[in-house]
UniProtKB/Swiss-Prot annotation:
Disulfide bonds join C26-C115, C28-C44, C43-C95, C49-C122, C50-C88, C57-C81, C75-C86. The lineage of its organism: Eukaryota, Metazoa, Chordata, Craniata, Vertebrata. Its EC number is 3.1.1.4. Snake venom phospholipase A2 that induces fast and sustaining local edema a few hours after injection (5-10 ug) in the hind paw, and prolongs the coagulation time of human plasma. Exhibits moderate hydrolytic activities and prefers the zwitterionic micelles (dPPC with Triton X-100) to the anionic micelles (dPPC with deoxycholate). PLA2 catalyzes the calcium-dependent hydrolysis of the 2-acyl groups in 3-sn-phosphoglycerides. Belongs to the phospholipase A2 family. Group II subfamily. D49 sub-subfamily. Expressed by the venom gland. The keyword Cell division does not apply. This is Basic phospholipase A2 Ts-G6D49. CDD domains: PLA2c (cd00125).
Length: 122
């Protein structure tokens, strides 16, 4: 669910997921269109694509379990959907951490009106 995803983001980046990622660029937050603005926004685009492959699952509300082993996120027990949602969220949280150096404040609270280019394919 969004709660676990938020906790993962906080653990991986040290950033508050709501204030830092909820409306970043063209793809972070609800919906998405246009060309991702940078690598962090591309993390969100890939995350949206990952969720899009999970037919019959409810990524925003399905609760899943994860733990850490030697600092790494490990998706734990649960249904197929729960495990797949966890893997999508894990990949995005790691992507955010790997792109912290290029995170741009100018893309925080970015208006979707600036996202008019053709959207890339997943």
């Amino acid at each position: 669910s969004l709660l676990e995803f938020g906790r993962m983001i906080k653990e991986e980046t040290g950033k508050n997921p709501l204030s830092s990622y909820i409306s970043y660029g063209c793809y972070c937050g609800w919906g998405g269109q246009g060309e991702p603005k940078d690598d962090t926004d591309r993390c969100c685009f890939v995350h949206d694509c990952c969720y899009g492959k999970l037919w019959g699952c409810s990524p925003k509300t399905d609760i899943y379990f994860y733990f850490r082993k030697n600092g790494a996120i490990v998706c734990g027990r649960g249904t197929w959907c729960e495990k797949q949602i966890c893997e999508c969220d894990k990949a995005a949280a790691i992507c955010f951490r790997e792109n912290l150096a290029t995170y741009k404040e100018e893309y925080h609270s970015y208006g979707k009106s600036g996202c008019t280019e053709k959207s890339p394919k997943c």
